[in-house]
Amino acid sequence: YDFTHDRVLESSSPNHVQPIASVTKLMTANVFLENNRNANCTASITDDDYDYIKGTHTKLPKYTPISCNELLKAMLVHSDNYAAHALSRSAGMSRLQFIQKMNEKARELGMRSTRFSDSSGLSDSNISSAMDLVKLAKYSLNKTQIKNLSNMPNAFIQAGGRSVFVKNTNKLVREEVFDAAVNKTGYI
């Protein structure tokens, strides 16, 4: 998709609906940034954040207050599922309310084929189409934090007096192959 000229360059089944995995985290970031009212918020990784679906792990320490900005960084750079769940709990609403906000935002953006059931993308029930994801990417371009974090090759996450090194899950970003406006990988 060419954002400059607002046109499709090439497509194959652009409206086909399928699971979107961690691309979900772009919506999580948008909803968090728009709804969090506490600039100094912190959250801890807890047992509630455990990945019972795929058994993924986190490099972040459990039961340690971590700033929401650092969790956002861990989520967008390293695609940390636990950070996504912790962020959804820290935006001043329940996890279920947060997911409802994600679905409301999708409808607001005209993403008719999109449904979210969790904030990390672990569930195969998070579905969308390529054309809907173009709408999400275009919307995400308005958030400098999302653009900057999704394009970082690596980062240090400050967590409880520790500095945790993480790499971007996107090899094209890590190796600086090209410069894209917004990046996010997803794997089912």
Language model: regions and residue ranges:
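Active-site-adjacent loops and short helices of periplasmic peptidoglycan-processing enzymes
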Residues: Y1-M131, K135-T144
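Domain-terminus/edge residues, biased toward the C-terminal soluble/receptor-binding domains
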Residues: M111-R112, S125-I188
